[in-house]
């Protein structure tokens, strides 16, 4: 830990995640490996995740993982970060939320926005695949307008949510 790594080192980078039960060629495992590779202090980091197949790979990593209910990842991270600050006042502990767009923006919107309003000191990473991929292909708030999916055969009617704009307003 603590050694500088580049993306070109990923083929040799196996300390944090190696084996996983994901489908062969799944982009989620690459995404998770990149996040783990970028952690400044993985030995002092706790990951928070929720429903979705990404939790299968995250939980196989050498980083503590908390599995929250669907949509409550930022609420869990808020309490976890505060608890870690009380328990380890001399050691900074990082909390990182890693979640898909459905769990974070649609179902977890309230917790996400309130963590921004309170200026909570943890990182939230959203994997925006623009659809509920695990449950059959329903549109999400992050789906582009007009996209035709299995569960929205006429195409999405509404615009994609402007999460960057909401984040700017919240801060």
Residues of each region from the PLM?
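Active-site diphosphate/adenylate-binding microenvironment
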Residues: 9-69
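Flexible, glycine/proline-enriched loop segments at strand-loop-helix junctions
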Residues: 18-24, 99-102, 147-156
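Hydrophobic/aromatic ligand-binding patch that stacks against planar heteroaromatic rings
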Residues: 37, 114, 166
């Amino acid at each position: 830990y603590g050694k500088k790594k580049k993306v070109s080192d990923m083929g040799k980078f196996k300390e944090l995640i190696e084996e996983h039960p994901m489908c062969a060629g799944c982009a989620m495992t690459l995404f998770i490996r990149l996040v783990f590779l970028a952690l400044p202090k993985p030995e002092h980091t706790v990951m928070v995740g929720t429903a979705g197949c990404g939790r299968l790979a995250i939980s196989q990593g050498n980083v503590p993982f908390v599995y929250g209910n669907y949509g409550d990842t930022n609420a869990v991270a808020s309490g976890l970060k505060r608890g870690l600050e009380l328990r380890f006042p001399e050691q900074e502990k990082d909390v990182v939320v890693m979640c898909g767009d459905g769990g974070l923006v649609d179902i977890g919107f309230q917790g996400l926005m309130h963590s921004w309003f309170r200026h909570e000191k943890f990182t939230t990473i959203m994997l925006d695949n623009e659809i509920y991929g695990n449950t059959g292909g329903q549109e999400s708030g992050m789906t582009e307008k007009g996209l035709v999916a299995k569960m929205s055969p006429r195409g999405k009617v509404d615009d994609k949510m402007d999460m960057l704009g909401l984040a700017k307003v919240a801060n």
